[in-house]
């Protein structure tokens, strides 16, 4: 049986939780009735299981040949698939795809496509419910823009929720985005938005549950190579014929 993997973002918190529970349970065992100690031990054990489960880090490797496929960057439920105005980077209409992550989902975030990271910015904000539409623009968030080898740009926005108080983004400008690699991590319930070209072909609908680095969300349209400019036909300059004067 394989030992469960724990994400590096949770190791310090798990150690702190174990120490805290030890400090709670030892006095309960010494100074309180056995039934009170048993209840406390059971409750604190459940808390430790939840914290450990929350920071689980499953191994997911997806092998696909088509570089235009978009892979889910996070676990959760699709809550938005619609054209919308993106005001922070593109300043134009894009196809927004949003995934809501509950506290029971894996909270690691993956790169949805391969390319080069152009932008990685963190913005402070509120901590409203991540399921609310305004959370995309008002909550604490991090924006990552990736340019594919075919020069198509997409944006991934990590959004903090009412419980999620910390966003971790590993992507930095100039980094190469590889499939099967973590883009970042969000602690507790949160949301991930993607902004895609309007002609992106989508394979999922609102209400569907997806798995990060497993579910194929859609496919970017093929980018046609620009046609070579037609050479302008050179026209011979017109010359005026000198009329011979009659003598």
Tell where the protein language model's regions lie, with residue ranges:
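Contiguous, well-folded functional domains in the mature portion of proteins
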Residues: 1-247
């Amino acid at each position: 049986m394989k030992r469960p993997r724990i994400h590096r973002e949770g190791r310090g918190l798990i150690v702190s939780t174990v120490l805290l529970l030890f400090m709670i349970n030892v006095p309960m065992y010494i100074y309180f009735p056995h039934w009170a100690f048993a209840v406390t031990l059971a409750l604190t054990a459940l808390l430790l299981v939840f914290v450990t489960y929350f920071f689980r880090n499953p191994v997911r490797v997806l092998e696909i040949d088509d570089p235009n496929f978009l892979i889910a960057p996070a676990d959760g439920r699709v809550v938005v698939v619609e054209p919308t105005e993106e005001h922070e980077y593109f300043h134009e209409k894009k196809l927004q795809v949003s995934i809501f992550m509950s506290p029971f989902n894996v909270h690691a975030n993956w790169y949805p496509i391969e390319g080069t990271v152009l932008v990685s910015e963190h913005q402070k904000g509120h901590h409203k419910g991540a399921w609310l539409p305004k959370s995309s623009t008002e909550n604490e968030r991090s924006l990552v823009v990736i340019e594919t080898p075919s020069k198509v740009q997409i944006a991934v926005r990590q959004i903090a929720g009412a419980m999620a108080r910390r966003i971790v983004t590993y992507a930095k400008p100039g980094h190469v985005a590889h499939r099967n690699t973590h883009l970042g991590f969000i602690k507790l319930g949160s949301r991930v938005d993607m902004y895609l070209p309007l002609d992106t072909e989508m394979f999922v609908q609102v209400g569907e549950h997806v798995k990060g680095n497993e579910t194929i969300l859609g496919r970017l349209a093929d980018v046609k190579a620009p046609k070579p400019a037609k050479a302008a036909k050179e026209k011979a300059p017109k010359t005026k014929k000198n009329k011979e004067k009659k003598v």
